[in-house]
Each structure stands twice: as structure tokens, then as C-alpha cells.
Amino acid sequence: MGSRKTALVKTRLMRALKRNREIPAWKRMMKEHKGEYNRARRHWRSKKLKIY
């Protein structure tokens, strides 16, 4: 990927990076959050972002 990106593309990539994390272990251990995980997780190779 080239380094010449617009500010809009950079912010969208940063946003996607933040959203691609799993739910913290301490939160999953709580009673209300049993069996909960991040369904929106994506792998960089299998699912591409539509930002361009």
C-alpha cells in the first residue's frame, strides 16, 4: 500500500483498526457478558474494507 493517503482515508483506516479489537477478557468474565464476542471482527486478508 502506498504512503500517499488523504486524511479521510487515514481516519477511516484508523477507525477500522480500533473497531477490529476483541472484547476485553475482564469484561467477558462478567456475568452479563458471558459468551459475548466481537462479531464485527475481520481478517485483513479475507474481508476487505470499502474505503476507496
UniProtKB/Swiss-Prot annotation:
Q: Which UniProt keywords apply?
A: Ribonucleoprotein, Ribosomal protein
Single biological process term from Gene Ontology? translation
Record-linked Gene3D superfamilies: Ribosomal protein L39e
> Which segments does the entry list as coiled coil?
none
Q: Which Pfam families does the UniProt entry name for this protein? A: Ribosomal_L39 (PF00832)
- Superkingdom of source: Eukaryota
What the entry lists under InterPro entries is as follows: Ribosomal_eL39 (IPR000077), Ribosomal_eL39_CS (IPR020083), Ribosomal_eL39_dom_sf (IPR023626)
Q: What does the record note on quaternary structure? A: Interacts with YIH1.
- Protein name, please? Large ribosomal subunit protein eL39
Which gene is this protein's source?
A: RPL39
